[in-house]
UniProtKB/Swiss-Prot annotation:
PANTHER family according to UniProt: UREASE ACCESSORY PROTEIN G (PTHR31715:SF0)
GO CC aspect terms: cytoplasm
Location(s), subcellular: Cytoplasm
Job of this protein: Facilitates the functional incorporation of the urease nickel metallocenter. This process requires GTP hydrolysis, probably effectuated by UreG.
Pfam family, one: cobW
Gene that specifies this protein: ureG
Domain of life: Bacteria
One example GO MF annotation: GTPase activity
Coiled-coil region: none
Binding site for GTP: G12, P13, V14, G15, S16, G17, K18, T19
Name the UniProt record assigns to this protein: Urease accessory protein UreG
Entry's Gene Ontology BP terms: urea catabolic process
Species per Swiss-Prot/TrEMBL record: Pseudomonas savastanoi pv. phaseolicola (strain 1448A / Race 6) (Pseudomonas syringae pv. phaseolicola (strain 1448A / Race 6))
Length: 205
């Protein structure tokens, strides 16, 4: 059993699929790990409410944080409100294995404080255009895992997945990335394998 839970930060622009990924991870991992979630919204708890409505986890395992300002600040410069939520979950549930911290939607410069997140997953979506990986930024270039979501929309928006693949490799070097479609579950197993491998997670027997 881990003395401290693995904290996985999930960031990305508004509408990229962060909450859908968080839901999918909860449904896939909740029977294998002692799991909890912190979500961030500026003025509401909409993402937390979505997870509760979809029965991602028991409601008491989900804390919705209202940042009241720039979502980037709440995960980077002043992460105190999120750190308090993490501490609250640790006190509430002994022996947590994993806490997912989902940021509010932000721009490509958003990054997590190392005090808040052990691993960072950054989510972008194909509907923003195939040039998005070339724009760079810490999320695209430096996150531990980049998820390129909504690949089913590529034909509808005229995006080239091949171009996104080559541009992402150029921008990220050896850092991993995954193409995904959360509607069908494509890419989810790769994301889970990354979290387990890099986070040294071991499921309870």
């Amino acid at each position: 059993m881990n003395s401290q839970p693995l904290r996985v930060g999930i960031g990305g622009p508004v509408g990229s699929g962060k909450t859908a990924l968080t839901l999918a991870l909860c449904l896939a991992l909740r029977d294998r790990y002692n799991l909890a979630v912190v979500t961030n919204d500026i003025y509401t708890r909409e993402d937390a409410d979505f997870l509760v409505r979809n029965e991602a986890l028991a409601p008491e395992r989900i804390i919705g944080v209202e940042t009241g300002g720039c979502p980037h600040t709440a995960i980077r410069e002043d992460a105190s409100i999120n750190l308090e939520a993490v501490d609250q979950l640790n006190r509430r549930f002994e022996g947590l294995d994993l806490i997912i911290v989902e940021s509010g939607g932000d721009n490509l410069s958003a990054t997590f404080s190392p005090e808040l997140s052990d691993l960072t997953i950054y989510v972008i979506d194909v509907s923003a255009g195939d040039k998005l990986p070339r724009k760079g930024g810490p999320g695209i270039c430096k996150s531990d895992l980049l998820v390129i979501n909504k690949i089913d929309l590529a034909p509808l928006v005229g995006a080239s997945l091949e171009m996104m693949d080559s541009d992402t490799r150029r921008m990220r070097g050896e850092k991993p990335f995954v193409f995904s479609n959360q509607k069908t579950g494509q890419g989810l197993e790769q994301i889970i394998a990354f979290i387990e491998r890099q986070g040294l997670l071991t499921a309870a027997a």
